[in-house]
Amino acid sequence: NSGGGIVALHAALVRQTDWKWLSELGGCDFNSDSEFLEARVMVDPNAKDHPAVRGFGKSFLYKADWTNHDKSVTGIPGIQVLLRIDESTYEPVRDFFKTRGGKAMGKDHPIAWINTLNNGRFFYTELGHDVRSLDTKFGRTHIIEAIHWAARLNKE
């Protein structure tokens, strides 16, 4: 609320329903996830100039374990989706969660977004379960530029 910044990775939104402030910032809660798999990631056309995704084209293949949330953040006031994932290119719910009510998100599956709630800056990405999803050119750029954006170290 006072203009600070938060960069949240992967599990930051797991079971935060008791922490209303973080739930409001993130816009959703965890439902399930996939195995570590390659999938098609798409840059939201309205976000192509955001520093955390700029220069990576309209879509690309990427490996991670992909998180499913209890709802999409699309359309929530203050939230801008940066990346979405094409669930037709991978199996979105691993077996462990299939037997425990885990659900895929469908055609609207955001995987990275920002929220400019009040005066602060919040960045969330599904990357970061472990180093495998971060130790690539995209992973490093995505996180470093997110930190710069949240800390207001760049022009955006």
Please give the residue ranges for each predicted region.
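Active-site histidine-anchored catalytic micro-motif
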Residues: 7-12, 25, 34-36
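Alpha-helix capping at helix-to-loop junctions
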Residues: 2, 15, 22-31, 58-61
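Stable alpha-helical elements in mature extracytoplasmic
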Residues: 18, 48, 52, 139-143
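Short alpha-beta junction capping motif
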Residues: 1-19, 119, 125
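Extracellular ligand-binding/catalytic regions of CAZymes and related secreted enzymes
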Residues: 88-91, 95-112, 116-156
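Oxidoreductase and adenylate-handling cofactor-binding alpha/beta cores
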Residues: 22-27, 62, 70-79, 128, ...
